[in-house]
A protein has these predicted regions:
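Glycine-centered loop/turn motif at secondary-structure junctions
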Residues: 4-5, 127, 161
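Active-site core of metal-dependent hydrolases
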Residues: 49, 56, 62-155, 165-170
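Divalent-metal coordination cores built from histidine and acidic residues
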Residues: 1-56
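Redox- and metal-dependent alpha/beta enzyme cores, enriched for Fe-S-associated oxidoreductases
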Residues: 156-160
């Protein structure tokens, strides 16, 4: 894509921690590979995650931030959120218990259910950005899974003064 005049960037990593990297180091991947701007999509609060501890998750975020600082890149960690009642607990602990700012962690799928959405508004009001996921069959997801419809969620976020992004994925 870059050769065709488009800008294309990516993350290093995987759902699980320890993350899979190209150089065996998050910091090295971000510093040495031009297109890598952060780490993701790390799964937490979900049955698909590796159930990382606070220390493991905080280390991934810290390494990603360090790689970003040293390379002049974003150093963002994109975090896949499931529908566990723990919601953003690990993310909030990193922000509250370390020197890493909320702006370094981008939780996605925040409209997965009403409880998670409410917690995400609180997180965004503390300085974090959040990411919606637009789904194909919105009636199904809203009715069966308690998902917050993107258009309604965006309005609620904007009314609260929050910063939002919308994730579009080719595979759902």
């Amino acid at each position: 894509l870059n050769e065709q005049g488009m800008s294309a960037y990516c993350y290093t990593g995987s759902y699980q921690i320890p993350v899979h990297t190209l150089t065996d180091s998050i910091v090295k991947d971000i510093m040495m590979i031009q297109e890598i701007i952060g780490t993701g999509e790390i799964a937490i609060s979900d049955h698909r995650s590796s159930q990382p501890t606070f220390e493991e998750f905080a280390r991934v975020v810290a390494d990603t931030r360090l790689g970003g600082v040293l390379s002049g890149k974003a150093g963002i960690v994109n975090v896949h959120l499931g529908d566990s009642p723990r919601c953003l607990d690990l993310i909030e602990r990193v922000v509250d218990e370390t020197e890493i700012p909320a702006s370094q962690i981008l939780p996605t799928h925040i409209n997965r259910n009403e409880m998670l959405f409410g917690k995400s508004i609180e997180y965004a009001l503390k300085g974090g950005a959040v990411d919606f996921t637009g789904n194909e069959d919105i009636d199904y997801w809203e009715t069966i899974c308690d998902e917050v419809r993107v258009c309604n969620g965006i309005k609620r976020m904007l009314d609260a003064g929050d910063i939002v992004t919308i994730g579009m994925r080719g595979d759902g």
